[in-house]
């Protein structure tokens, strides 16, 4: 202890900063490893009868023991309202560059665990090289910002979490619950909340303009997500009406799309989804002023409400199910 104390006292200012940075990143890496270890334990326990507390499996096992009926659970969920509220505070400490690098490290470590199970020595070596590369990147990345974020920056930062987490995981949550309830539809009980750009706790930088910006940016993020999903769905549903039938509603939706491409004239699902995509793109312009990326689009009428989008997608879904397509693009729909 005395030797360490003496060594630390003899450090120059620059050396002390390096030591502090090293320990900071070391703790970050330890946290990533601990999170992944906990995730592995949870995944293992989910495969056993003794499910880990807090998991959906544990919760539904308890429902079974208490002989809860699906109708009771659906009724409670129909009245429930869970709303995680995002604030700027968690995003002010770390830079986006640091968070992105740490996310990449986490993804590499997840792949590493799978490669170990496969005993794939060659790919393990490549994985280790990738891991070292990102750690070097992290070490050479500035940890702190030189200037404070403004409200617009805070809005952009928090929206990154929607893209990386919420938009992917919330549908999985609903699907898992619905499967456990006999594939019955569950009411929308999980709704995101957000203070950024609209909080009224005395922040002098929050105005009606920042609130308007926040609402538009959130809308743009959600609509762009749907645009991407509809585009991917169109690439998956390459169904020819010469080979399988389609509902009259689906054929009408395809006709209304006015798709000029002759190569898709026998593919009503793609035509219908092009129409849905075009209307979503028009909605994006109307509500946010932003434009959809790429893809030549015919002029379309914007959607007036979310129910109209859902209705069109239901036409695609119902036709798919009625014409031997239950296994087609089920997850995405």
Model regions and ranges:
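Often metal-dependent polyanion-binding catalytic scaffolds in large enzymes
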Residues: 1-333
